[in-house]
């Protein structure tokens, strides 16, 4: 459950290598719904401003299905393994909600940015919690399976949120922001994809081959 939440607010884990939260039964489940730079800030802002919009109701239904295994399995003939490849459907809806929120100057991103920042801060706190090693010793900053990768993911996610805050300030001041939003979004997409691909290769069995 927590891994699903994390994957929508931060860059998702590399397939088959859960990082902060282990899930042996869902390593290849394609859990992920993060929108580069925007995270869930645009979705939250849109939902707050237009609570009766059809997309808000649809996303709530999708969230319920994602959290309840039997409803989630209905998307792939009630298979016993947890898969989340159907997430691409609500992700497209959330991208639309984010775009509409960005285009409508009356919608403020402040609450969405604050909530996303709070979730990222909570994940950072969890990552530094002490962990008992196989020798019985207590180790700090090793709660994540791959601490270095988690640190990079967290930094990129926070940087995206800071860019979004800057763009929202331009919007509130009535200044042109679309070019800045486009460049920032493309940069965030490249950074997010590069981080996943790079660590997917370096953490593999034969990194030299790639």
PLM feature spans:
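Periplasmic/ER-lumenal interhelical loops and adjacent helix-loop junctions
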Residues: 1-52, 72-76, 83, 130-149
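Contiguous transmembrane helix-bundle modules in multi-pass membrane proteins
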Residues: 55-77, 81-210
């Amino acid at each position: 459950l927590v891994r699903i939440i994390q994957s929508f607010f931060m860059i998702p884990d590399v397939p088959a290598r859960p990082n902060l939260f282990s899930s042996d039964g869902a390593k290849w489940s394609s859990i992920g719904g993060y929108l580069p730079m925007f995270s869930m800030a645009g979705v939250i802002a849109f939902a707050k401003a237009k609570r009766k919009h059809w997309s808000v109701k649809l996303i709530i239904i999708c969230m319920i299905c994602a959290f309840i295994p039997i409803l989630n399995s209905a998307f792939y003939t009630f298979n016993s393994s947890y898969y989340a490849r159907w997430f691409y459907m609500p992700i497209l809806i959330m991208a639309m909600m984010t775009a509409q929120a960005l285009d409508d100057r009356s919608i403020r991103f402040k609450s969405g940015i604050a909530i996303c920042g709070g979730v990222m801060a909570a994940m950072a706190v969890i990552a530094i919690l002490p962990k008992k090693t196989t020798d019985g010793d207590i180790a700090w900053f090793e709660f994540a399976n791959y601490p270095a990768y988690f640190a990079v993911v967290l930094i990129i996610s926070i940087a995206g949120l800071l860019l979004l805050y800057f763009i929202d300030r331009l919007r509130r001041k009535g200044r042109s922001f679309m070019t800045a939003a486009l460049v920032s979004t493309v940069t965030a997409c490249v950074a997010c994809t590069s981080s996943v691909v790079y660590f997917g290769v370096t953490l593999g069995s034969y990194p030299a081959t790639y």
